[in-house]
């Protein structure tokens, strides 16, 4: 008998009304690119991001986005749940942009449990999906796991426009450089602290 233990799970489903969101949000996002700056602690020099800026745009559209996201997120949880959303931002990739490997553990005290990526504008023939890294990569080198050694060190999900990914915030991931294209790759990302799961409640 062989038993695989301690899985790492990511979730994926479609966002309702993505086409309407795309029609309403893509152009305002593209119009803001000249105002965006790359955060100082990011390695990439070829990405447009609203991280740490453009908060008014996000705040003005957060309720609309969450109304569409909640139905999708409901599919991910197997019991009653509550979430406190801590960050919202968008990234735009146009000309070979990339995102270095990173996680979403920004706070030492109130770190998020789950992170999300919504592929608002995405062409799977033109754009690169995120790549997730095995969190036990270094430890696996200390042992022989036979079948597990053929699993590779990264997982690349198959994503389409309108998909929403949910994954543990500690899970490191990156986006490899894409090719030059006239089609913008636009994602909306956000983090969440779980405040209720089943009968357990966290006061936040």
Predicted regions and their residues:
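Exposed beta-sheet edge/beta-hairpin loop segments within beta-rich domains
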Residues: 155-158, 177-181
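A short hydrophobic beta-strand segment most commonly corresponding to one strand
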Residues: 114-118, 182-198
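Short beta-strand His + acidic residue motifs that chelate non-heme Fe in jelly-roll/DSBH
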Residues: 100-104, 173-180
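Catalytic core of non-heme Fe(II) oxygenases with the double-stranded beta-helix
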Residues: 94-166, 198-203
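Non-heme Fe(II)/2-oxoglutarate
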Residues: 1-81, 98, 129
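A short glycine-rich, His/Asp/Glu-containing loop-to-beta-strand
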Residues: 84-92
């Amino acid at each position: 008998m062989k038993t695989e233990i301690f899985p790492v799970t990511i979730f994926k489903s479609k966002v309702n009304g993505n086409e309407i969101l795309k029609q309403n949000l893509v152009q305002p996002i593209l119009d803001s690119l000249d105002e965006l700056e790359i955060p100082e602690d990011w390695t990439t020099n070829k990405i447009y991001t609203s991280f740490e800026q453009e908060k008014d745009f996000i705040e003005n559209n957060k309720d609309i986005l969450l109304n569409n996201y909640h139905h999708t997120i409901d599919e991910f949880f197997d019991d009653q749940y509550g979430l406190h959303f801590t960050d919202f931002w968008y990234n735009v990739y146009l000309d070979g942009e990339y995102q270095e490997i990173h996680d979403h553990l920004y706070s030492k005290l109130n770190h998020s449990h789950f992170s999300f990526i919504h592929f608002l504008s995405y062409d799977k023939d033109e754009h690169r999906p995120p790549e997730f890294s095995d969190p036990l990569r270094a430890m696996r080198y200390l042992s022989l796991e036979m079948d597990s050694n053929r699993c590779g060190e990264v997982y690349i999900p198959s994503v389409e426009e309108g998909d929403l990914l949910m994954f543990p915030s500690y899970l490191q991931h990156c986006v490899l450089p894409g090719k030059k294209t006239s089609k913008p790759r636009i994602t909306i990302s956000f983090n969440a602290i779980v405040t209720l799961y089943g009968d357990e409640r966290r006061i936040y």
